[in-house]
Amino acid sequence: NMAVLVIDIPSNQVVAYCGNVHYNTKQEGNQVDIIQAPRSTGSVLKPFLYAAMLKEGSILPHTLLPDVPININGFTPENFNMQYEGAVPASEALARSLNIPSVNMLRKYGIAKFQKLLQQWGLRTLNRPATYYGLSLILGGGEATLWDVTNAYKRLVENIDPSMALRKSQAELQITGNVQGLEKKESF
């Protein structure tokens, strides 16, 4: 199954909406509008954790995070490639979507605190106790609708100068606006 939701940020209009590949066929699962159905979040929540920890000063982009085998009460997360990188800068861990640094960060930040932040950003389906999700929340252990996830990212994008990706150094970046729960400097 596949779904696509594209929103034009300036106009706040839905540009493309495809709830499933062949929505009207009789093939199993094709009658589900995946945009409105809660699905595993996978790794899409990682940027929100990084932003929250930047805001509180727990990490900086170049903070080294451990990417080594861990076992937390029987929970042994692994990276997608089943390899370990040792010490990795936070910005690289996020860019590469490394699981182990993210789990360690969530452990430090707090699951309940992170869940509350996600709810503030509009993820309405994360309504069970934080203990239900555990550390797997950051790896897809929770569910959200594509509407909610898209709107949360939209809030983030609305407050970042889109041309910053074309600039050469952080010193040249200009952040505009304010993200709910984040200051301008953290939303970068």
Go through the PLM ranges and name each one:
Residues N12, D33-L65, A93, A152-V157:
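Active-site SXXK
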Residues N30-I35, G86-A87, A95-S102, T131-I138:
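Flexible glycine/proline-enriched surface loops and loop-helix/loop-strand junctions
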Residues Y109-R128:
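Short, charged, amphipathic alpha-helices and their helix-cap/turn boundaries
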Residues I9, N24-T25, L54-T63, R124-N127, ...:
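Secondary-structure transition/capping motifs at alpha-helix termini
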Residues L123-L182:
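Active-site-proximal helix/loop microenvironment
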Residues I59-F114, E158, P162, G177-F188:
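Conserved catalytic neighborhood of penicillin-recognizing serine enzymes
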